[in-house]
Amino acid sequence: MDNGTATLERVEDTLQLGSRLGEQLRAGDVVVLTGPLGAGKTVLAKGIAAAMDVDGPVTSPTFVLARVHPARQAGKPALVHVDVYRLLDQHGADLLGELDSLDLDTDLQDAVVVVEWGEGLVERLAQRHLDIRLERVMHSDVRIATWEWVRTTGDDAECSAEEERCR
């Protein structure tokens, strides 16, 4: 999966981008969605879920922290949709500890984990992650999305194009 940028003029564009990215994700992948309130993070997660063909409606899990969406097909990964917005004010929040305390019905290594508001916290979940940033164009409904695989170990260097998904 290459790094990239897209202009998203409609909600459908955001869903399509999520679907395109979701088709390439596999078990053990971690995706971080970053952007201001209303930028389209949950809409993008819906597109990822649609491509992965998982059960259940994808809604913002803000008040429950995480939702597990099982795969409809055997052998395919589940989607764990996490929203850590309410943890942002807690200095030193332990995302992994919070997820462990939820007793999720799936092993995170067997799922694709999509984390809204996870910047600065997700590094404890994986050695690398797909960083997707959504920004709103002022006085417009247009969003700009950028995405790249980022290594979260060592010197925190971004993945080079030659490295297959930072592995």
Q: Where are the model-predicted features located?
A:
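P-loop (Walker A) phosphate-binding loop of NTP-binding proteins
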Residues: 36
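Conserved lysine of the Walker
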Residues: 41
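Short beta-strand-centered segment that lines the nucleotide-binding/catalytic pocket of NTP-utilizing
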Residues: 54-69
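Hydrophobic anchor at the beta1->P-loop junction of P-loop NTPases
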Residues: 31-33
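Short phosphate-coordinating micro-motif centered on Lys-Gly-acidic
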Residues: 2-5, 90-167
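Phosphate-binding P-loop
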Residues: 23-28
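N-terminal pre-Walker A segment at the start of P-loop NTPase domains
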Residues: 1-20
